[in-house]
């Protein structure tokens, strides 16, 4: 029915992409965890909750920048 059936397993290219983005994915998961803790803090978020949230946000930004820099370096190497 399908000309190119959807593979059941990730391709090597997909695995390589996941590996390249792994640190960003981990940072984003930590950010979601910090956001959940912040939003569910009783009776209100503490200074520690605020600090945890800021650190998680900053980590995501650092990892995004690092990922873009690695990508740009790889383009320069090809050119």
Give residue ranges: language-model regions:
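Short, compact, well-ordered microdomains
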Residues: 38-79
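Long, non-catalytic architectural segments outside compact domain cores
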Residues: 1-24, 65, 69-79
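Alpha-helical initiation/capping and key positions within long helical/coiled-coil segments
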Residues: 17, 24, 31, 48, ...
